[in-house]
Amino acid sequence: MRDMVTSHVVTASDRPSAGRAEDRSGPLLAEWLAGRGHTVERVVVPDGEPVAQAVRRAVEAGAELVLTTGGTGVTPRDRTPEVVAPLLCVEIPGIIEQVRAVGAAKGVAGAPLTRGVAGLVEGEHGRTVVITLPGSTGGVRDAIGVLDPLLDHLLDQVRGGDH
């Protein structure tokens, strides 16, 4: 596996994107990825089409991994799954299923309400792993727990590595 992985973290949240609140989940993801040796770029955008635009820009820039946080719930403004799902050429539903299961096992009543999606987006530089995660810091910590032992293998597989 290559030493340096380029990752993008996209926070989907109306208040932080307008400067009216602090983004707490994006920095958690960025810190975790940087600790794994990734080069990390971060952006905060309003939910909806700006999320899809940020994901497309990351793919076009050659990112190997894009993690979004926020916009996966059931409020009228939560649109991240709807705008990211059409970009996927391959779905990987087990990742989000596991994140939900971890939250539910901890007794988080709202864990089943996250509607995240995960998969691959085809770009001119190859395929990019895109995973849409909850916006809460607890949901992000659960996701990190799921992804930490899996991420190197996942990225290697996407690059064409063996099982």
For each feature predicted by the language model, list its residue ranges.
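Non-catalytic beta/alpha edge segments that cap or flank active sites
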Residues: 1-163
